[in-house]
Structure formats: structure tokens, C-alpha cells
């Protein structure tokens, strides 16, 4: 789901601060993605200063960049957000000649619908969404999305503060495709999330895993 290759750090540096004594690379990434020690080592080895900001959701990232308040050399939007930002002229094309290791990326992850020619993005990370639960409190088999709508867990349910993921969970519960564009199916998913709202304690991002410790 997550895109833009980390090795672009070595390429994008040409674009930033080239007129300054110390070149600077401006990076905007998901929280908990890169250890600060790694950034420090990169700065020592290359002499390039990294200004590293993080975001919690694609929507937070989009709003900040769209507002024009910040400009970054390297960002990490998810698949659907790449399409949106590309269509709105918010992304620069990538010169793949500067990324020789691109040819080693698994072919399953290149040429996707959101960027068929990989002109604007390079695969960086892939993953799926699942259900995390405390086995000391939930003893029944968790084999369906239905459990997130079970009234007996009222105010003990945390949902991702992400439109894509929350709507996706509702679509899967309904038996629809994650990538449906059918207005009726999306409307059904929206209604299902509204019905679920009284059961939800909070809509969170990284806080979910902290509460499980």
C-alpha cells in the first residue's frame, strides 16, 4: 500500500539545497517508519542534512502539502493518494534512470493501476490491514469483520482514523471488493460505519498498538 522508494534519498538530494554549503533533504513520512539513528548515520555518511517530518494519515499529509505551507523532496503517500496528488499536479515525475535498483523490485508491485508507468512513485512498502485483539479479553475465534460490529464489545473497539481502511473494513464485512467504485456499495459501507459508531471507543492511528501493550 505504501509507496516511494527509500533509496530515493540518494537521488533526491540533488534537488534540495544545491546552492547551500550544506545540502538539505526534506522528507515527510509516516510515524514510526525510520529510526532517528538511521537518519543520523545517513547525515554522517553523506554530509546531507535531513529535515524529517511525520504524519499520521494520508489525509493529514495531503492537507499540509495542499495548503502550500510546506514543500518536501520525498513523501510517502499510499496508493490511492498518489493518484489524487498526481491528478492535482502535486507530484513531480521521477527519472528512473537515476534509480538503477528499480529493476530489482518484485514485479508484482510495479505498474499498478494508481501509477501504471511508475513515473510518480516507486514501491517502498506493502502490507495488509487486519484485526488486532487482546487474547486475554477476546476468547472467541476472530475470523470475520463482524466482530467489529458486535454490541458486546461496545466502547472497547478502536477503529483506524483512515477513510480508506475503515471503509475497507465495512466493504469486506458486506462482502464487497475493497476497490469497489459502485456508489450503492460505498453508500452501504458508509451506513454500516455510522451504525457502528456508538460501539467505537475512539478512531486512532498509532495509538492502537500502544493500548495493546
Residue map of PLM features:
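Glycine-rich, phosphate-binding/catalytic loops in enzymes
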Residues: 1, 44, 91-94
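Hydrophobic alpha-helical segments with strong N-terminal bias
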Residues: 1-4, 62, 112-114, 118-119
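Short, low-complexity disordered leader/linker segments with a strong preference
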Residues: 1-25
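Conserved phosphate-coordination/catalytic loops
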Residues: 5, 56, 139
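Short, flexible, glycine/charge-rich loop motifs used to bind or transfer phosphoryl groups or to couple energy/partner
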Residues: 8, 14-18, 63-66, 121, ...
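Early extracytoplasmic/lumenal segment of secretory-pathway proteins
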Residues: 18-84, 209-210
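Extracytoplasmic ligand-binding site segments that recognize negatively charged/polar headgroups
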Residues: 71, 76-213
Amino acid at each position: 500500500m505504501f509507496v516511494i522508494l527509500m533509496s530515493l534519498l540518494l537521488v533526491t538530494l540533488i534537488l534540495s539545497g544545491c546552492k547551500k554549503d550544506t545540502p538539505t533533504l526534506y522528507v515527510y513520512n509516516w510515524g514510526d517508519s525510520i529510526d532517528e539513528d538511521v537518519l543520523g548515520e545517513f547525515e554522517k555518511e553523506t554530509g546531507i542534512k535531513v529535515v524529517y517530518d511525520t504524519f499520521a494519515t494520508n489525509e493529514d499529509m495531503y492537507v499540509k502539502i495542499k495548503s502550500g505551507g510546506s514543500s518536501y523532496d520525498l513523501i510517502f503517500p499510499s496508493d490511492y493518494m498518489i493518484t489524487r496528488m498526481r491528478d492535482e499536479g502535486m507530484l513531480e515525475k521521477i527519472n528512473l534512470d537515476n534509480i538503477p535498483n528499480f529493476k530489482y523490485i518484485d514485479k508484482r508491485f510495479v505498474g499498478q493501476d494508481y501509477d501504471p508507468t511508475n513515473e510518480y512513485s516507486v514501491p517502498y512498502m506493502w502490507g495488509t490491514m487486519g484485526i488486532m485483539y487482546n487474547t486475554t479479553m477476546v476468547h472467541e475465534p476472530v475470523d470475520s469483520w463482524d466482530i467489529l460490529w458486535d454490541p458486546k464489545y461496545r466502547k472497547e473497539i478502536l477503529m483506524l482514523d483512515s477513510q480508506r481502511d475503515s471503509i475497507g473494513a465495512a466493504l469486506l464485512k458486506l462482502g464487497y471488493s475493497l476497490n469497489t467504485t459502485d456508489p450503492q456499495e460505498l453508500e452501504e459501507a458508509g451506513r454500516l460505519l455510522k451504525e457502528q459508531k456508538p460501539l467505537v471507543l475512539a478512531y486512532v492511528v498509532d495509538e492502537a498498538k500502544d493500548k495493546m501493550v
